[in-house]
Amino acid sequence: MIDSLDLVIDTIVAREVLDSRGNPTVEAEVLLEAGAIGRAIVPSGASTGAHEAHELRDGDSRYLGKGVTKAVNHIEDRIAPALCGISSLDQASVDGTMQELDGSDNKSSLGANAILAVSMATARAAANGLGLPLYRYLGGPMASLLPVPLMNVINGGAHAANNLDFQEFMLVPHGASSFRESLRMGAEVFHTLKGLLSAQGLSTAVGDEGGFAPNLANNDAAGDLLIQAIEKAGYSPGKDISLALDVASTEFYQDGCYAFGGGRYTSTEMVNELEKLVDRYPIISIEDGLAEDDWQGWALLTKKLGKRIQLIGDDIFVTSTKRLQQGIDQNVANSILIKVNQIGSLTETLQAIDLAGRSGYTSVISHRSGETEDTTIADLAVATRAGQIKTGSLSRSERVAKYNQLLRIEDELGSQAVYAGATGQGPRGRS
């Protein structure tokens, strides 16, 4: 029998490690009294919302200013003394203690990267101390829903050095009967797409998230290529595999207009452009179709398309219950993107997912463009029964690590495993 004292935090250490872009990030290890260890590494974004929690960087000559030794030192000098002696099972107390110690509204004192690393490592240590997988520890005995992956196979915008305005063009294999099958379907289309690009003399180099980053004539050309790849791989667009977009429109929002494709569009015109895309392609989900503070534009987008497709708020919500509640009150979007480092603690992440579910919004668990081998978000997707995950393409090990963890979870669950696409709990195709 496990003694509760065995699960008390004994030691916390931190170090500066590298993410998938070669930039420093924070790793934390939490050691419990009985010897269980939890380790976590935080990710970092490229296109970041203005309202995200503060990522603390050193700003000196090391790593061109991107070092994180300040955050590492905060963990070992300030956070560790405050948390040692607290039960790892009391996640809310652990996270609350760090927030109180920080004292700011956006975690700018200690750094959200410092707080989150310890928060996630604590949960991992508690799970290990109890002998449970992380998804079971966080989600309880009913955690058995495997998410539909939104696979970013063509990268643009801030994620690639090409001429595509929109940031992500994704495959959504909702027609699969299992997560394993969805992964196979996505991989087959991914490799078929590579062949199509090569045949046209286009680049098959990949961007930050493992998708291809070719120079194409326009955003429509990307959609056309994906339809061709889906069909050539033997699948039916809209039935087996649909499309999703991350427009990341904040990135090209200038002086009240959306500047892309050689034109400038008002919010109303931008909504009309997105509606045309939904009419033309089997798109079932659009993320950040409008900019992070264009609340009126978002309301119009939701009124026009909210009953037809999933409208995900990323930059506008930043995994914040306060901003999500504002969106709920104003009928903005119908889904929230969940990025643990946007809000900076596991407790607040779970609160955002809970609020979304109670309000009829879907949640999409997401990686960042600067990722690591950490697989926490895979377990989080299953634990929270979110039904959807965004973790990149079918290449680059930091992306595939999450897919492989979901395969392990599906195997471990056996007959209990349920694929969200097979039950209609993920995004679904349009007839």
From Swiss-Prot:
Cofactor: how bound: Binds a second Mg(2+) ion via substrate during catalysis.
GO cellular component: cell surface; extracellular region; phosphopyruvate hydratase complex
EC id: 4.2.1.11
Assigned keywords, A-Z: Cytoplasm, Glycolysis, Lyase, Magnesium, Metal-binding, Secreted
Superkingdom per UniProt: Bacteria
Residue positions binding Mg(2+): D246, E287, D314
Keyword ATP-binding: no
Positions bound to (2R)-2-phosphoglycerate: Q167, K339, R368, S369, K390
Major location (coarse): cytoplasm
Record SUPFAM superfamilies: Enolase C-terminal domain-like, Enolase N-terminal domain-like
Active site: E209 (proton donor), K339 (proton acceptor)
GO terms for MF: magnesium ion binding; phosphopyruvate hydratase activity
Functional description taken from the UniProt entry: Catalyzes the reversible conversion of 2-phosphoglycerate (2-PG) into phosphoenolpyruvate (PEP). It is essential for the degradation of carbohydrates via glycolysis.
Protein's recorded name: Enolase
